[in-house]
UniProtKB/Swiss-Prot annotation:
Biological source species: Polynucleobacter necessarius subsp. necessarius (strain STIR1)
Function of the protein: DNA-dependent RNA polymerase catalyzes the transcription of DNA into RNA using the four ribonucleoside triphosphates as substrates.
Protein name: DNA-directed RNA polymerase subunit beta
EC annotation from Swiss-Prot or TrEMBL: 2.7.7.6
UniProt-listed PROSITE patterns: RNA_POL_BETA
Record GO biological process: DNA-templated transcription
CDD domains in alphabetical order: RNA_pol_B_RPB2
Quaternary data: The RNAP catalytic core consists of 2 alpha, 1 beta, 1 beta' and 1 omega subunit. When a sigma factor is associated with the core the holoenzyme is formed, which can initiate transcription.
Keywords recorded for this protein, A-Z: DNA-directed RNA polymerase, Nucleotidyltransferase, Transcription, Transferase
Higher taxonomy: Bacteria, Pseudomonadati, Pseudomonadota, Betaproteobacteria, Burkholderiales
One GO CC term on file: DNA-directed RNA polymerase complex
């Protein structure tokens, strides 16, 4: 097996039974690929595909002027290099973007000969700025990281559905169809309760569908011919005969005696016609059946009937036959007659009935009716009517089905080909109506709109493209207007275009769209989950209020595509989903999931991705089906799925098998060990709460994991990966330098990679992002190996919480209702200490009275308050500050006030300056204590920098120079090594230190020379001489390149900053706050078992084991049975085994056991069950490192749905606690429980308790952020009551129920002061304050302000109300 650098150091023992050959795909590939398709930045202009920006440009261009003499064509586009890198954009508050320039060609035609080109002008036009995606799939917009969430929306195409009988009181099913384009008007068809078929455009007023059919060019005869079969009759003097069609007679009631050709009665009147009767008629070779006139009356004429002599129309198509009409026809000598065939069962007369309600006569009248419906009140001019109708469904400018839409329409209407025009055709409309009528006649099925074959995902690229198109279409309109002037005023392409509309459309989308969200950066998992989220909300999606149960529910097609577990609790449940682990999008935007192919019950390694529609055809087995050694399905019957149904089938019928048991869940859910033993609701909470885990100061890998921790950590981008393999050359806390392997460098490339680590940086959620190197100088790393750990990662594995020894038992009520009791030792060891970084900023503006100044010179401030500020008035890095301390001194000019004579005198004596400025310094907010870790000063162009700003720039440049010097050092070292190899043993023509001609060059001679003088040696061989020259010039070129890079960096740093208008200077101060665990903090396991810390008990009071070790956490056993999340118990047992095995390894290491003994024990641990590890191929040194890392516990992986069995857990416990150890610890025989002792009395508890190790997380709901107190503060303007909430420094609400409580106690005085002086009696509360200051404790309650508000409210309703005082 191939282990990475970090994997080999600490191998995770996996219980997986199935070897999964199909690797989990790169978890943020969806985002990256989608945006790369949109930009196509790395493709040459000529070979770009028509998608993304290219598609937007080609659809908007060419633009032709209204007079047709000028035309603008698009040639190509290019994206420039971004001016600042990601880190610089975050610091300065810029957007990480690239300028888009399009090359366009302006062609002007000759007015005399319009086909002749008069002149052609080509130039590049600036088209605005396009935000770029960072390598981790996020965007930096105005300095903050954001994510564009993918949207799940209804796919374009045609859909058939019914109202489930809810519309009409009779419960009749009303069928409807809807054609949804990607953009353009929606077309709906619907039946009403009377079975008349209507259509609507864009949900406007409904009209009979035959109006639309006439508008597309059909007349009444054609309409009937399209929708009905015809019955043929021959008329005779008294009655007639009907053509005999067997299918149409079967099941009918005979309304007259039916005779065969010979006049024999075959079917008597009022009898139901059955198959026997039909056979008799066929046996008698019956061609026609005689019918009386009554049978003809009431039937509907299928074609216009014309008098052969006069040419007069006797009956129109769709007229009913009456006795009079029959007489007229016989008089006119009409012999043949066609009527439409209908019956009540499977061919209703719906279109015929609809045609009767339609009053339009011809195509034009029908189009005018549609025009009036869409544009009420406008006169229908023939041209306007024609243009409107064409633009509705037939024009590519206004209507676009899209490739997906065309594919869905063709497949739903059962057409063989999947391609076609992107606009609607008359056939599409006709076929849709036919399908809808068939549905009403009972043929076919309605569509399921929640099926993932009918919902598609719009990714970042597509959403951005739509915005870009919208901006481009505004530009197009403006250009069209100005093109007319192009020839007369001799304008260039860039004079005609204005990029503002494009920029504003893009800026609006990335800045404020509902789908552009502030990235959740609490920990690596929350980051990755946010990028894999799929939302049904947003523009063009669902509304939260209107989404019903069906849309939110889990659907069979979610299997392997969307996670059935991970979705938020609350109003968004089911509307926001997460992508399943292996899911990906196909070219049409539908979700696909991989399966392994099975043929003749043999499972192959071929992996096929299927969408929800394709999957329905196949029989698919689950991943846990038993497979024998030869790769065949072993069971007689295999559990399988087909089209959403589960069944047991024989192995021969299986077409595919799942690639992995974890394929149905998302990344977060697949990190929950023993997920299969948890109730679904709790699993949901567990998956969601992992995203809220705060990164701890000392990350600790979970002892019980699922094996996915490494993948999530690597894909999230928090850890640093080696871009190329090589040897570690230098390591410190800030950077890692790797000398790259020769075979991974190309000629002329720098053979050195420098990784600058992120140190103590603030995340979006104020948590701390910090990277720590995990390699040593001399280590050999391969490409993709982890070089440095990030936040919440431990040796390249995700580590969200800490492994705690837990006991399940009640403890004096301190774990009542899910509370958690924690040992003081946990706090003392800094297990849950986390660092939070607050960003505080202050700006100096130009005001009308003069400019604000950042300075140390502030009057009325004691020197002790200024002691932490430097001469520029900015706090030192490393200063420890608390609430109220000054961070940045700032003074603001004050308006001149009229002075009293006394003040004038004082001013005259003590000098002028003091009072015309006021102190507006930046201070530490209330409730915050911390250390200053960074300060950034931004100064506007043209304003002199202060000393602090200059020193910051100097430091930054020094750091940059250090990196360049490192690269140069390695490059030069490499070059001189090559030079030495080249020269030694060669004959010289001369050289420094009087080297004689013809001398052989040796090592000693070169060692004596200064490095750079070696280039002055003149080899006799010309070939060697030219190689020496090449090495020299490559070094010089590199030096020059590095110097240029340094100068560029200096320019960037020294140019003025782009600040908001009126701002001259901005200072950002970063404050690191250490948060220790304390009562009130929320904690949780990974199984939805959450609670609040109730007490931190001294370690000596905690229950302890027989060997004297106290437990870390005491949990309430009552939290398990009713919640049915038994996974936590299994995790606890397996964690206990992991810790016990760690202790055994630790003992062996301490006693310096022999290598062979250690190796044997490790082989026993790893290879008894589950996945086999390749321990034999480890070197002794690697075994030592592995054992060293296992001393804290052997990490286990129990993959979701394929995890450790009870027997395996038992076996691991036996290995961990041999008989004598188990006895000494007073364990039960199963080793899953033990007798504990009470820490306060030392007595044993009377029964064993479950003890083990659980991975427990500290969540982002910290009591420090919620704790808040107020004495006096701001009041609401209208009601004069105190505001609410910590952010407003508000008071505590004394609500309706609290008032009842005081009433119940009869505490009238308390109640009175609550409702008056403590709330909104303005005069009373001021008086109380005065009284308290004077030391008098009396209150005088007055009128609450809210009563006056009530009086005003009632008066506003026009009721006079006055307060009378007695």
């Amino acid at each position: 097996m191939n282990y990475s650098f970090t994997e080999r150091k600490r191998v995770r023992k996996s219980f997986a039974k199935r070897v999964n050959n199909h690797q989990v795909p790169y978890l943020i590939a969806t985002q990256l690929e989608s945006y790369a398709k949109f930009l196509q930045a790395d493709k040459p202009a000529m070979s770009r595909l028509t998608e993304g920006l290219q598609a937007a440009f080609t659809s908007a261009f060419p633009i032709v002027s209204n007079n047709g003499y000028a035309r603008m064509e698009y040639v190509s586009y290019q994206l420039s290099q971004p001016p600042f890198d990601v880190k610089e954009c975050q610091q300065r508050g810029y957007t990480y973007h690239s300028a888009l320039r399009a090359k366009v060609r302006l062609i002007i035609y000759d007015r005399e000969a319009p086909t002749k080109v008069k002149e052609v002008k080509e130039s590049e036009v600036y088209m605005g700025e396009i935000p770029l995606m960072t390598e981790n799939g996020s965007f930096v917009i105005n300095g903050t990281e954001r994510v564009i969430v993918s949207q799940l929306h209804r796919s374009p195409g045609v859909f058939f559905e019914h109202d489930k009988g809810k519309t009409h009181s009779s419960g009749k099913l009303l069928f409807s169809a809807r054609i949804i384009p990607y953009r353009g008007s929606w077309l709906d068809f619907e039946f009403d309760p009377k079975d008349i078929l209507y259509f609507r455009i864009d949900r406007r007023r409904k009209m009979p569908v035959t109006i639309l059919l006439k508008a597309i060019g059909l007349n009444n005869e054609q309409i009937l011919a399209n929708f009905f079969n015809f019955d043929h009759f021959s008329l005779t003097a008294n009655g007639g005969s009907m053509e005999f069609v067997p299918e149409r007679l079967r099941g009918q009631l005979a309304s007259f005696d039916v005779l065969d050709e010979n006049g024999v009665v075959v079917i008597q009147k009022d009898k139901r016609i059955n198959t026997k009767h039909i056979r008799e008629l066929e046996a008698a070779k019956t061609k026609t059946i005689a019918v009386p006139d009554d049978y003809l009356i009431g039937r509907v004429v299928a074609r216009n009937i014309v008098d052969p002599d006069s040419g007069e129309i006797l009956a129109y198509a769709n007229d009913e036959i009456t006795e009079e009409l029959l007489a007229t026809l016989r008089d006119a000598g009409i012999k043949q007659l066609e009527t439409i065939y209908t019956n009540d069962l499977d061919s209703g007369a719906y279109i015929s009935q609809t045609l009767r309600t339609d009053e339009t006569a011809d195509q034009m009248a029908a189009r005018i009716a549609i025009y009036r419906m869409l544009r009420p009140g406008e006169p229908p001019i023939e041209d306007a009517v024609e243009v409107l109708f064409q633009r509705l469904f037939y024009s590519e400018d206004t209507y676009d089905l899209s490739r997906v839409g065309r594919m869905k329409v063709n497949s739903r209407l059962n057409r063989p080909e999947m391609e076609g025009p992107m606009v609607l055709s008359s056939e599409d409309i006709l076929d849709t109506i036919k399908s809808l009528v068939d549905l009403r006649n009972g043929k076919g099925e309605v569509d399921d709109i929640d099926h993932l074959g009918n919902r598609r995902v719009r990714c970042v690229g597509e959403l951005a493209e739509n915005q870009f198109r919208a901006g481009l279409s505004r530009v197009e309109r403006a250009v069209k207007e100005r093109l007319g002037q192009a020839e007369t005023e001799n304008l260039m392409p860039h004079d005609l275009t204005n990029s503002k509309p494009i920029s504003s459309a893009i800026r609006e989308f990335f800045g404020s769209s509902q789908l552009s969200q502030f990235m959740d950066q609490t920990n690596p998992l929350s980051e990755i989950t946010h990028k894999r989220r799929i939302s049904a909300l947003g523009p063009g999606g669902l509304m939260r209020e209107r989404a019903g149960f069906e849309v939110r529910d889990v659907h069979p097609t979610h299997y392997g595509r969307v996670c059935p577990i991970e979705t938020p609790e609350g109003p968004n449940i089911g509307l926001i989903n997460s992508l399943a682990l292996f899911a990906r999008l196909n070219e049409h935007g539908f979700l696909e999931t991989p399966y392994r192919k099975v043929s003749n019950s043999k499972v192959s390694d071929e992996v096929v991705y299927l969408s929800a529609i394709e999957e329905a055809k196949y029989v698919i087995a689950q991943a846990n089906a038993t497979i024998d050694k030869s790769g065949k399905l072993a069971d007689e019957l295999v559990s399988a799925r087909q089209a959403g149904e589960t069944m047991m089938v024989s192995p021969e019928r299986i077409d595919f098998i799942d690639v992995a048991p974890s394929q149905i869940v998302s990344a977060a859910a697949s990190l929950v060990p023993f997920l299969e033993h948890d109730d679904a609701n709790r699993a949901l909470m567990g998956a969601n709460m992992q995203r809220q885990a705060v990164p701890c100061l000392r990350p600790d890998k979970p002892l019980v994991g699922t094996g996915l921790e490494r993948i999530v950590a690597v894909d999230s981008g928090t850890v640093v990966l080696a871009a190329r393999g090589g040897i570690v050359d230098y390591v410190d806390a800030n950077r890692v330098v790797i000398r790259v392997n020769d075979d991974e460098t190309t000629a002329g490339e720098v053979g050195v990679d420098i990784y600058n680590l992120i140190k103590y940086t603030r995340s979006n959620q104020n948590t701390n992002i910090n990277q720590r190197p995990i390699v040593k100088v001399g280590d050999r790393v391969a490409r993709g190996d982890v070089v440095a750990d990030g936040a919440s990662t431990d040796l390249g594995e995700l580590a969200l919480g800490q492994n705690m020894t837990v006991a399940f038992m009640p403890w004096n009520g301190y774990n009542f209702e899910d509370s958690i009791l924690i040992s003081e030792k946990v706090v003392a060891d800094d297990r849950y200490t986390s660092i939070h970084i607050e960003e505080l900023s202050v700006v100096a503006r130009d005001t009308k009275l003069g400019s604000e100044e950042i300075t140390r010179d502030i009057s009325n401030l004691a020197e002790s308050q200024l002691s932490r500020l430097d001469e520029s008035g900015i706090v030192y890095i490393g200063a420890e500050v608390e609430a109220g301390d000054v961070l940045v001194g700032k003074v603001t000019p004050k308006g001149e006030t009229t002075l009293t004579p006394e003040e004038k005198l004082l001013r005259a004596i003590f000098g002028e300056k003091a009072s015309d400025v006021k102190d507006t310094s930046l201070r530490v907010p209330s409730g915050m204590i911390g250390t200053i870790i960074d300060v950034q000063v931004f100064t506007r162009e043209g304003i002199e920098r202060d000393a602090r700003a200059q020193s910051i720039i100097q430091e930054e440049l020094q750091r940059y120079r250090l990196g360049l010097n490192d690269q140069l050092r390695i490059v030069e070292g490499d070059a001189f090594m090559r030079l030495e190899k080249l020269l030694i043993g060669k004959v010289a023509n001369g050289g420094p230190k009087k080297l004689a001609k013809g001398t052989k060059i040796d090592k000693e001679y070169l060692a004596d020379l200064d490095k750079y003088h070696r280039f002055d040696v003149r080899p006799a061989d010309d070939e060697v001489a030219s190689q020496v020259e090449a090495i020299k010039s490559s070094i010089e070129a590199k030096r020059k390149q590095f110097d240029e890079a340094f100068e560029e960096k200096r320019t960037k740093l020294t140019q003025g900053d782009d600040l908001q208008p009126g701002v001259t200077k901005m200072v950002k101060v970063y404050l690191a706050v250490k948060r220790r665990l304390q009562p009130g903090d929320k904690m949780a396991g990974r199984h939805g078992n959450k609670g609040v810390v109730s007490k931190i008990a001294p370690a000596e009071d905690m229950p302890f084991m027989a060997d004297g070790r106290p437990v870390d956490i005491v949990l309430n056993p009552l939290g398990v049975p009713s919640r049915m999340n038994v996974g936590q118990i299994l995790e606890t047992h397996l964690g206990w085994a992991a810790q016990g095995i760690g202790k055994r390894v630790d003992e062996m290491v301490r006693q310096q056991a022999k290598q062979a003994e250690l190796r044997e024990f490790l082989k026993q641990l790893y290879n008894e069950t589950g996945r086999i590890e390749d321990i034999d191929n480890f070197t002794d040194e690697q075994i030592t490192v592995l054992a060293e890392n296992l001393r804290q516990g052997l990490p286990f992986a129990t993959p979701v749905f394929d995890g450790a069995t009870e027997a395996e857990i038992g076996r691991m416990l036996e290995l961990a606690y041999p008989e004598e150890v188990a006895t000494s610890l007073k364990m039960t025989p199963s080793r899953q429980q033990m007798i504990l002792c009470d820490g306060r009395t030392g007595d044993q508890f009377e029964r064993p308790a479950t003890v083990g190790v659980m991975h427990v997380l500290k969540l982002h709901h910290l009591v420090d952020d919620k704790m808040h107190a107020r004495s006096t503060g701001p009041y609401s303007l209208v009601t004069q009551q105190p505001l609410g909430g910590k952010a407003q420094f508000g008071g505590q609400r004394f609500g309706e129920m609290e008032v009842w409580a005081l009433e119940a106690y009869g505490a009238s005085y308390v109640l009175q002061e609550m409702l008056t002086v403590k709330s909104d009696d303005v005069a009373g509360r001021t008086k109380v304050y005065e009284n308290i200051v004077k030391g008098e404790h009396t209150i005088d309650a007055g009128m609450p302000e809210s009563f006056n508000v009530l009086v005003k409210e009632i008066r506003s309703l026009g009721i006079e109300i006055d307060m009378e005082r007695n």
